[in-house]
Design a protein with these regions (language model features):
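Anion-binding and metal-coordination hotspots
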Residues: 1-224
Length: 224
């Protein structure tokens, strides 16, 4: 069986908001609504606690040309301003009285040509494609030995959670991958508190002021 993952990515942080697995025989234009609904559900789940924005608030939808269609552009929510790459056309476009589709297509085309639209498309190429490269190529998720879409999706979501955790660690400590942590200066310390012995890993992290901070993690403990 073949499946295709779709990511909803925050272009500011690069974090994956939603990752949905679809059957590979479904086109991008038919799966976009399901993926956006999943992103909305996840944002609503954390909105009250974390103050996360909801999908009903104004947002920009940036996508490649595979998601471009008249129906997709017409059916987008009012809060959405689309910037979806437009495939090439032969000849003139004919609307047959469908003014809503005409306005949606021309509005999307105009936003793509703006400086903001060009900047968002560059960010899409960097951050969205990076999430796929980390999960599918570097992460080895191009091929999985699992049966059923539900099992594949659960495995993939765990992988995406690890990708998001790397972004969080990089923001907090400056290192987000095992290779990055391996390059950090570190030391192992042995400490004894009463009858409790601790093995502590200390990692020195550079900050903007060139005065290193340190992070301590207890990696083992035992009672004497």
């Amino acid at each position: 069986m073949a499946y295709k993952p779709e990511h909803v990515v925050d272009l500011e942080s690069g974090a994956v908001v939603s990752a949905v697995i679809h059957p590979a025989d479904r086109g991008d234009t038919t799966t976009l609504a399901t993926t956006l609904d999943d992103a909305q559900a996840k944002l609503c789940a954390v909105r009250d606690r974390e103050g996360a924005p909801g999908i009903d608030e104004p947002f920009a939808l940036v996508a490649d040309k595979g998601y471009h269609s008249r129906k997709v552009l017409k059916d987008l929510p009012d809060a959405c301003t689309s910037r979806i790459s437009e495939p090439g056309h032969k000849g003139r476009l004919r609307w047959h009285g469908d003014t809503a589709a005409r306005d949606a297509v021309y509005g999307n085309r105009g936003r793509l040509k703006s400086e903001k639209g060009k900047a968002l498309m560059r960010a899409r190429g960097e951050r969205v494609e990076r999430s796929f490269a980390h999960c599918l190529d570097r992460g080895g998720m191009r091929r999985v030995h699992l049966r059923g879409l539900a099992n594949v999706e659960k495995r993939y979501i765990i992988h995406v959670a690890g990708f998001n955790l790397g972004i969080l660690l990089r923001a907090l400590f400056g290192f987000g991958t095992p290779r990055g942590w391996a390059d950090a200066p570190a030391a192992l310390l042995f400490a004894r508190i009463g009858n409790l012995s601790l093995l502590i890993l200390v990692i020195w992290l550079p900050n903007a002021a060139d005065t290193p901070d340190c992070v301590m993690m207890v990696i083992s403990r035992w009672h004497n």
